[in-house]
């Protein structure tokens, strides 16, 4: 009898220790559909952390490491499910209609909240100042307040019903995806660290990305934009601005650009010719660039594209393709030459006129068989951006990276500014 009592005491102490290991003051609560399996994936503060999942009479304690545990199903025996313990990152994605509400206000240390593809109508993250990642896309959110989440790096809230989004307090954001909502205005001027911005399929009328100098991907397709200036986004690699009302684009300062989808806009043949001439030169082993100025061969804009001189793009190692099937556009009839819009034909291989270095960073030197009276440099739109008189060199350090035309006493050649 004494042995039994001693054993019972040991068992009680063991379970008491186990229970004490769970931090019951730190928890996340879900509103769930009773009788369903709820899929969860957990990441704890430290390896071997005890976490308790409670729903009705169903209680289960699991050991969680400081890495994803792989998703497991937990039976919802009631309309709520509470996850107790030091959970650092929480994933309840892909439960569809089985998760309708989420409350993480009692887990102030939470760094990652991943709750996409449910039917959640509201999320309060005002008590989660340590949050780094919030992925709440594919839900039913009408509002989202992230003003208290100043450490946020990644925000994905696409496919909800948001009419506005304020990210002015989230200066650490590097990725923002608010696509497929009902947003009419988006201010990203404070988000100077953004490298990826996805805001397609909204109702945005203007988009200023001049402060987002680290952008590599910009997707603003299917909005109400009439203009787009990417001159400050010198590291931009991919641009998707299709389905707007944009009338002009200039890529002369986007030396890293490799993919452009600009179909279904207000781009004329002349503007498209200028766009081709402003594309960065990807010859010399660079990956071939792709530009999609038209959706398919049946599109009303196809005749406009065929009226351009596609050779100006292919000469820079760019393929002009239909967006829908990735096939090359052929049959161009245009004759426009990339001369900066000045009406002067580009002169090549003139022995009496040479420039160096090319590409150039600062000082451009010019050698001719006669004294140079005037030097004029034009961008791809024909705007003069630099000039000098009675000189054999010109300082171009102030010019943005891109392609320019140099005119020296009637002779013309092209340079690349690094």
Predicted regions and their residues:
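N-terminal capping/linker segments that flank leucine-rich repeat
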Residues: 3-5, 15-112, 129, 144, ...
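C-terminal outer-membrane/trafficking sorting elements
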Residues: 345-418
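Positively charged n-region of N-terminal signal peptides that target proteins for export
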Residues: 1-3, 417-418
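Canonical leucine-rich repeat
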Residues: 100-102, 123, 144, 165, ...
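Solvent-exposed strand-loop boundary residues in beta-sheet-rich modules
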Residues: 55-59, 96, 119, 140, ...
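Conserved hydrophobic beta-strand positions in leucine-rich repeat
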Residues: 90-92, 111-115, 132-136, 153-157, ...
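Conserved hydrophobic position(s) of the canonical leucine-rich repeat
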Residues: 87, 99, 110, 120, ...
């Amino acid at each position: 009898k004494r042995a039994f009592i001693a054993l019972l005491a040991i068992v009680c102490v063991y379970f008491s220790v186990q229970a004490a290991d769970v931090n019951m003051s730190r928890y996340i609560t879900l509103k769930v559909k009773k009788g369903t399996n709820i899929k969860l994936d957990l990441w704890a503060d430290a390896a071997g952390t005890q976490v308790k999942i409670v729903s009705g009479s169903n209680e289960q304690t699991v050991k969680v490491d400081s890495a994803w545990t792989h998703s497991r199903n937990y039976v919802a025996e009631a309309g709520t499910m509470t996850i107790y313990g030091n959970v650092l990152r929480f994933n309840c994605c892909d439960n569809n209609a089985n998760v309708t509400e989420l409350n993480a206000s009692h887990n102030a240390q939470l760094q990652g909240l991943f709750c996409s593809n449910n039917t959640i109508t509201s999320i309060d993250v005002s008590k989660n100042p340590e949050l780094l990642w919030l992925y709440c896309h594919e839900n039913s959110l009408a509002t989202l307040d992230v003003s208290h989440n100043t450490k946020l790096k990644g925000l994905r809230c696409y496919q909800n019903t948001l009419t506005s989004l304020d990210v002015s307090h989230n200066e650490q954001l590097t990725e923002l995806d608010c696509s497929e909502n009902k947003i009419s205005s988006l201010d990203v001027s404070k988000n100077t660290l953004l490298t990826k911005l996805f805001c397609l399929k909204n109702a945005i009328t203007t988009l200023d990305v001049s402060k987002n100098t680290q952008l590599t991907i910009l997707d603003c397709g299917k909005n109400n934009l009439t203009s787009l200036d990417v001159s400050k986004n010198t590291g931009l690699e991919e641009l998707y601005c299709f389905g707007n009302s944009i009338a002009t684009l200039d890529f002369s300062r986007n030396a890293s650009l490799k993919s452009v989808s600009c179909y279904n806009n207000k781009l004329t043949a002349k503007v498209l010719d200028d766009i081709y001439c402003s594309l960065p030169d990807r010859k010399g082993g660079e990956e071939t660039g792709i530009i999609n100025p038209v959706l398919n061969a049946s599109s009303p804009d196809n005749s406009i594209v065929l009226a351009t001189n596609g050779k100006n793009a292919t000469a820079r190692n760019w393929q002009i393709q239909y967006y829908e099937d990735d096939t090359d556009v052929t049959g161009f009839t245009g004759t426009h030459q990339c001369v900066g819009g000045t009406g002067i034909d580009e002169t090549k291989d003139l022995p009496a006129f040479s420039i160096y270095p090319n590409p150039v960073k600062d000082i451009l030197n010019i050698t001719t068989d006669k004294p140079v009276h005037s030097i004029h440099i034009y961008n791809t739109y024909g705007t003069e951006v630099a000039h000098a008189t009675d000189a054999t060199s010109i300082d171009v350090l102030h010019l943005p990276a891109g392609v320019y035309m140099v005119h020296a006493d009637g002779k013309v050649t092209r340079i690349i500014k690094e």
